[in-house]
Curated annotation (Swiss-Prot):
It is found in: Cytoplasm. One of its GO terms (biological process) is protoporphyrinogen IX biosynthetic process from glutamate. GO terms for molecular function: uroporphyrinogen decarboxylase activity. This is Uroporphyrinogen decarboxylase. It is an enzyme of class 4 (lyase). It comes from Chromohalobacter salexigens (strain ATCC BAA-138 / DSM 3043 / CIP 106854 / NCIMB 13768 / 1H11).
């Protein structure tokens, strides 16, 4: 069946649309009271991810509230390292942690490469359940963390401020780091292809920590592996193109090389001006972004003003997907998200047609 709303797919292909499409990173999440209620039913965060019906429910919640142009699979970027038997757990207020770390060539060699269909079948069950529930209303976005970003969590044992263990391995034993990234690139390719086969119509690679690298290190240890993944992905499924979005937080200085990766779109955080990004790479890729999520803590008028500024910065014509520059904060007022979406719907049509 054709999609009732293919606005996002058209924008990613840089084809004309009637208004700028919008979705939000972490649009299903803790800022919504209904999410908190469902999370309470599930028990732990990973129990929520592993229950296809509940993962579907929280995926659908923001679409019931807001006129969004896509659903994004409710899951976590750390499902792959979890399937590598590193013992993922969540500390209240501290985020994800691993019971085991990977800090040597021997530890890298010992890592199993998961089979996505077998070891991450709960994710594919969620994708299938969500696609059925969506009933072709809007497209479903699947996702993964990038190899470099996954590696940082596996080496550090959780999130980090300085990434000293990851960078020590990268500079001190680059062969071991490349071996780890190679395993992860193969795993991510398999994982995203399994999501596409299960029904994901768009995929995004989240390179949350690529921006902490030097330019040569970014190209060698992050972007090269994302480009390899893009090359290995299923790009046609269910009779249509499957777009790929790459998002490196704080990666605006590398737009040209990211645009050469083979991806259809590049995600931007709020530190890169859209007009500048469009002038540099807008003839090659669509651009996604880039409202600072903290703008949503301001008044509805201030939110509207910033939406207007970003739309004007991109300018007229296709190729822009409106999003936040990072995930929506758990402390955001849902009514302020509504003000954001309403402002976009009201203001963006003048830039199209």
């Amino acid at each position: 069946m054709p999609l009732q709303n293919d606005r996002l797919l058209r924008a990613l292909a840089r084809q004309p649309v009637d208004r700028t499409p919008v979705w939000m990173m972490r649009q299903a999440g803790r800022y919504l009271p209904e999410y908190r209620e469902t999370r309470g039913q599930a028990g732990s965060f990973m129990d929520l991810c592993r229950n296809a019906e509940l993962a579907c429910e929280v995926t659908m919640q923001p679409l019931r509230r807001y006129a969004l142009d896509a659903a994004i699979l409710f899951s976590d970027i750390l499902t792959i390292p979890d399937a590598m038997d590193l013992g993922l757990y969540f500390e209240t207020g501290e985020g994800p942690k691993f019971r085991k770390t990977v800090r040597s060539a021997e530890a890298v060699d010992a890592l199993p490469v998961p089979d996505a269909e077998r070891d991450l079948d709960y994710v594919m069950n969620a994708v299938r359940t969500i696609r059925h529930e969506l009933a072709d209303s809007v497209p479903l976005i699947g996702f993964s963390g990038s190899p470099w970003t996954l590696a940082t969590y596996m080496i550090e044992g959780g999130s980090s401020k300085d990434f000293r263990h990851a960078k020590a391995l990268m500079y001190g034993d680059p062969a071991a780091m490349h071996a780890l990234l190679d395993k992860l690139a193969r795993s991510v390719t398999d994982y995203l292809n399994a999501q596409i086969r299960a029904g994901a119509q768009i995929v995004q690679i989240f390179d949350t920590w690529g921006g902490v690298l030097s330019t040569p290190a970014y190209r060698e240890f992050s972007l090269a592996y994302m480009a390899r993944i893009v090359e290995g992905l299923i790009r046609e499924h269910e009779g249509r193109h499957v777009p790929v979005i790459l998002f490196t937080k704080q990666g605006g200085q590398w737009l040209e090389t990211i645009a050469d990766s083979g991806a259809d779109a590049v995600g931007l955080d709020w530190t890169t001006e859209l007009s500048d990004a469009r002038a540099r790479v807008g003839d090659r890729v669509a651009l996604q972004g880039n409202l600072d999520p903290n703008v949503l803590f301001a008044s509805p008028q201030a939110i509207r003003d910033e939406v207007a500024r970003i739309l004007a910065s991109y300018g007229s014509g296709p190729g822009h997907v409106f999003n936040l520059g990072h995930g929506v904060s758990q402390f955001t007022d849902p009514d302020h998200v509504a003000a954001f979406i309403e402002a976009l719907h009201e203001l963006s049509p003048r830039y199209h047609g």
